[in-house]
Amino acid sequence: MDRSRIAILIPAFREAATIGAVVKAAREYADVIVVDDASPDETGAEAANAGAIVIRNETNLGYDGTLNRAFEEALSRGFAFAITMDADGEHNPALVNAFKVLLIEEAVPLVLGVRPRKQRFAEIVMGLYVRLRFGVKDILCGMKGYDMKLALANGGFDHTNSIGTELAINSLRRGTPFRQIPVSGTQRQDAPRFDRRLRANMRLLVA
């Protein structure tokens, strides 16, 4: 399987303690692009030392803005597929192989991860809409796989600060075929570095 066709995209903010190990593990399966969201620590340096392609935001752009830059970088480098992952180790990099098989060998354009943990109330509310309309179990899981043609059709990854869901939901609305696979990893114990405010998703709930 040609690894030059696929990139792992990781947005990172103040993740110096974990990003190096995440990148090293992920690079076993694909090239890694890390976008450092103007972190005040050594996040970018740790990612670069581990072998990632690193770009840095001069100002803090947040989760969606940072992933926008990651998708732009991947497209500019000619990658045909992308897998998004978190920088904190919540997603097991070994799962990349399962995503690659679906994206490349089985030509599934959209692959959605499903977390095993219990979801918060607001996540359940958001998830209920997406589950009922599209049959998606966990739209807020940060590990997703995309054919880059979906990003081109959407004009990028995000325009609405959607907590990482706009591209997936808009693709689903277009009737894009998808598959779901369980994802595992280590759930972080402290607060998420990116402020993923769930109320932002309400912009996507209008049919």
Model-derived segments and their meaning:
Residues 97-120:
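Conserved donor NDP-sugar-binding/catalytic core segment of glycosyltransferases
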Residues 66-67, 71, 118-207:
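Conserved catalytic loops of nucleotide-sugar-dependent glycosyltransferases that act on lipid-linked
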Residues 36-45, 89:
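A conserved acidic beta->alpha catalytic loop
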Residues 44-77:
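Conserved donor nucleotide-binding strand/loop of the catalytic core
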Residues 5-7, 166:
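Cell-envelope/extracellular polymer assembly enzymes that use nucleotide-activated donors
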Residues 9-28:
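Short, well-formed alpha-helical segments that are part of the catalytic scaffolds
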Residues 79-90:
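Short beta-strand-to-loop acidic/aromatic patch adjacent to the donor-nucleotide binding site
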Residues 17-21, 41-50, 94:
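Acidic helix N-cap motif at the loop->helix transition within catalytic regions
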